[in-house]
Regions:
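Short SAM/SAH-binding signature in class I
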Residues: 140-148
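Short "lid" loop at the C-terminus of a central beta-strand within the Rossmann-like core
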Residues: 151-152, 183-187
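Class I S-adenosylmethionine
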Residues: 1-120, 124-137, 155-156, 187-196
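Conserved S-adenosyl-L-methionine
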Residues: 202-203
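A short glycine-rich, Lys/Arg-flanked "PGG" loop and its adjoining helix->strand segment in the class I
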Residues: 160-174
Length: 203
């Protein structure tokens, strides 16, 4: 799955001063940042802010109306999206990397998962297989499904096929949101995802 590591910085420097910050890297790409101060530990960071893919949650009507939400995270990373969870929310996360899966739950490194305000279930497996099992089990559909598995060097194309997209929509509520994070240093995924949107008449 490539080299992963956590970099510790202090207020944006390495001089040991300021606020301690942990940054999660996979290769040369930073996939998660946490401010290691209690009053700031649940602050969404990086591309998970309300101005990034976090808007799929933050901008949802149920979030604004303080109603319970069900959120599925495909590509757990360090679980930054759990920062949005509230007491009655349910979050489900998938990841295929044993190292990433373990690190996300190590509260010495990151606490988004361990200190999550809502209920969190995590699975170390291929997300598509896990979702197929959820569908077979008749789970309650989700309000938001966020696919964040395409930012690395190796693209899991089976998570972007028509069959995969069909699966996501089967597991979404009628007013649900499907968010696909397409940032990638090597490939331009926008045309492909745009075609999917047109095919499904998504606005």
């Amino acid at each position: 799955f490539g080299t992963i590591y956590v970099r510790e910085v202090y207020g944006g420097s390495f001089d040991g001063k300021g606020i301690k910050i942990h940054e999660f890297y996979h290769g040369e790409t930073c996939h998660g940042v946490q401010i290691m101060r209690k009053e700031m530990e649940k602050m969404p960071t990086g591309y998970y802010t309300p101005y990034g893919c976090g808007y799929a949650i933050w901008g949802h009507s149920k979030y604004r109306e303080n109603k319970p939400m069900r959120v599925n995270m495909i590509g757990l990373g360090m679980g930054v999206l759990c920062a949005y969870a509230r007491a009655n929310d349910y979050y489900r996360g998938y990841d295929v990397s044993p190292e990433t899966f373990k690190l996300a739950q190590d509260e010495k490194m990151f606490t988004f998962v361990s200190h999550c305000s809502g209920k969190v279930d995590l699975s170390l497996c291929d997300a598509r297989k896990g979702l197929e099992q959820e569908l077979s089990n008749g789970v309650e559909p989700y309000d938001v499904i966020i696919v964040d598995a395409f930012t690395g060097d190796s693209i899991p194309y089976h998570l972007s096929t028509k069959e995969a997209i069909d699966l996501y929509f089967k597991l979404l509520k009628p007013d649900g949101v499907l968010c696909i994070h397409i940032s990638n240093k090597h490939l331009d995924l926008q045309p492909y995802i745009k075609r999917i949107g047109l095919e499904y008449n998504i606005k």
